């Protein structure tokens, strides 16, 4: 795995995590 792939994976993980935090926040968690 090269640095470009690792960068894209970290960006996708961070994006998915932030979306789930927003969804949980709206649900009252």
Curated annotation (Swiss-Prot):
* Gene Ontology CC annotations of this record: cytochrome b6f complex; plasma membrane-derived thylakoid membrane
Membrane topology listed for this record: Single-pass membrane protein
Which top-rank group of organisms is this from?
A: Bacteria
Example GO molecular function term? electron transporter, transferring electrons within cytochrome b6/f complex of photosystem II activity
**Keyword Membrane in annotation:** yes
Q: What residues form the membrane-spanning segments?
A: 3-23
Sorted alphabetically, the keyword list is: Electron transport, Membrane, Photosynthesis, Thylakoid, Transmembrane, Transmembrane helix, Transport
KW ATP-binding (keyword) present: no
Q: Name one GO biological process term.
A: photosynthesis
- Family note: Belongs to the PetN family.
**Assembly behavior:** The 4 large subunits of the cytochrome b6-f complex are cytochrome b6, subunit IV (17 kDa polypeptide, PetD), cytochrome f and the Rieske protein, while the 4 small subunits are PetG, PetL, PetM and PetN. The complex functions as a dimer.
Briefly state the protein's biological role: Component of the cytochrome b6-f complex, which mediates electron transfer between photosystem II (PSII) and photosystem I (PSI), cyclic electron flow around PSI, and state transitions.
Q: Which protein, by its recorded name, is this?
A: Cytochrome b6-f complex subunit 8
Organism, per UniProt?
Synechocystis sp. (strain ATCC 27184 / PCC 6803 / Kazusa)
Gene that produces this protein:
petN
């Amino acid at each position: 795995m090269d640095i470009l792939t690792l960068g894209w994976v970290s960006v996708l993980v961070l994006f998915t995590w932030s979306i789930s935090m927003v969804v949980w926040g709206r649900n009252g968690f």
